[in-house]
Amino acid sequence: MRLLSSNSMTRSVLRGMTLGAIALGVSATATAQDPEEWFTLGGDFAHTRYSPADEITAENFADLEVAWEWDGASFKAVSGRSTPSLIDGKLFTVAGNKRHVVAIDPKTGETLWSYREPDTPRGEYSMRADYGKGVGFARIDGRGVVYIASPGFFLTALDADTGVPIEGFGQPVPIDGFPRTGVVDMLADLGHPYDPYEGLPLETGYITSSSPPIVVNDTVVVGNSAEQGYHQSRVENVPGDILGYDARTGAFKWKFNVIPKPGEYGHETWENDAWEWTGDVSSWAPLSADPENNLVYIPTNSATIDYYGGFRPGDNLYGAALIALDTRTGERKWHFQMVKHEIWNFDNPTAPVLLDLDMPGRGKVPAIAQITKQAWVYAFDRITGEPLWPIVDKPVPASIVPGEVLSPTQPHVTKPAPYDMQGITIDDLADFTPEIRQQAIDALANYQMGPLFNPPIHAGNDTGKFAAMNCPGGAGGANITAPAVADPETGKLFVSSHKACFALRLIPGEEADLLYPNTTGVTLSEWANAGPGATSRPPRHPAGIPLWKPPYSRITAIDMNTGDHSWMIPTGETPNRIKNNPALEGVDVGNTGTGALVPMVVTKNMLVYSDAASDGTPMLYAINKETGEIMEQIEAPARSSYGMSSWVHDGHQYIILQTGSTLTAMALPGAQAQSSGGH
């Protein structure tokens, strides 16, 4: 067992943000746009998901039709997590739990080529197999190269025209079926003993990938992920160190230690020698970059085991942080830790968004904005790391769980204002009628309500409560299924969020271990998550409605030049289960929103989002970017998930919906192709 000595309980607190030596400069390339290109899964290096395409307007939006559908069933595609890149007249994406790489004709939807990595146990085991999200891309000597990080944690470089592995890239992999060139075994560069075929021993930990690499100038930067922290009951794992490779040769360039080693900045934030044997801190979310300044931005997740960290006392840097690294060397330029000693599942869920702002009294500012599950936008100068508005440490509740020592303070954003509910009190509960309000109060009687950083509680605690309410919970606020989007011409950020409270309850580690077969590590944690999913049994309203006041989901427009909210709208329509609920008969509930996070894309003329009508009919909405008003709405074949995109091909604008196992291309009638689509 890992035991805490008495002196290991002494806390060492570091400022959230520190600076290294940085050359000053304002990038004009991170947010550069070409309507005929969608370069990264976020559209550009800045992850704005913006297109200057303007063929689709409020006047013709109702004329949109399905131009083609690409069916990924033959690749066993399910989730729709991957946003295709449009580069040099081809779409590139990944599909299925084998993470097939696929090139698609953007006019017809026909498959041009596909590539699949040979099967390995280390790839088969990945709990993030169908999480690929997209590809990386670079032009090497005029040749297009597609890069993919696989579930088995191999980096592969493919010819963009043929799908053939690139000659002279990487080293031969000693596994039958692998190409002799074009592949890098990235496990070798993490520094842990492993078997090339089987991967890391589960007793040591597990590393996989859930987002694509990003190619910044001549460096391929790769993040990674581990198993979901709410499925863990043992304390050992490996850190998800960030890796850099030569884009031309695949040669290893650098590694950034996300859990600092002795002598490195932040090492003292890991007490009990936890840096030696625990892990998980990584970047499962996508990365963004400022190529002109050779900077890549790493949004990190939490350390091992969601909801309990008694075995890893300290602030646990660089968990739940945003890190700026020099792409040439991997050197840290600055960082900010959003949550110290993170135990709420408040990992950073999306790539940060880069904007070039014009701030009153300050002029031009190269900015970066990180949306979070906790309903704050953390905004910084992306070159220096200085917050655009003060972020102040404030006291937060202590834990009553034996062995858990939380940070006494957490950073609080002062501007922009939160874009959704933070914490929960009686005043936040549904009050359509006095009876409904009392029923909501009664439903929460056995739950510990509290502020944003309300800590989990354990079974058998002295309060007699079943669980602690965590609002927002680990599903957001904002989350990966609906990344924020931005208009670089105006500096407006559009954030999709929903009220998604979790109930946090811990049980003894030996009991939790029975819920999670094949978990990593060997030593049982004293406490672990009591639910088979991310939350324990939540409270329910007897009327079958949410316990809290609407809106249940929303889009908030934030002017990042000033930090002020411009407008807020509920998303979709009030579901029939609420609109026609007998308990609400005669009550005008207004538009509550569906409660779902909504994928969005921004164009020259509008904000577009995907949600549903009251009866569940999938809908596509065109929104006025300045006012939030609905300009038009149409039925769609299905709801999009994890993102949307828009670009121009052959003179016509398309909107791509990620509809589960398919991709659906919407366009005006003039763009209709003769083909009905590919695989």
Residue ranges, per PLM feature:
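Long, low-complexity segments enriched in small/aliphatic residues
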Residues: 288, 410-502, 510-511, 554-557
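N-terminal signal peptide c-region/cleavage motif recognized by signal peptidases
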Residues: 25-27
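N-terminal pre-domain segments of enzymes
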Residues: 32-55, 409-418, 424-438, 442, ...
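Repeat-blade elements of multi-bladed beta-propeller folds
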Residues: 38-42, 77-100, 126-154, 205-234, ...
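Extracytoplasmic/lumenal domain signature
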Residues: 59-73, 101-125, 141, 155-203, ...
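N-terminal secretory signal peptides that target proteins for export/translocation
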Residues: 1-12
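Mature N-terminal segment immediately following signal peptide/propeptide cleavage
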Residues: 32-75, 86, 556
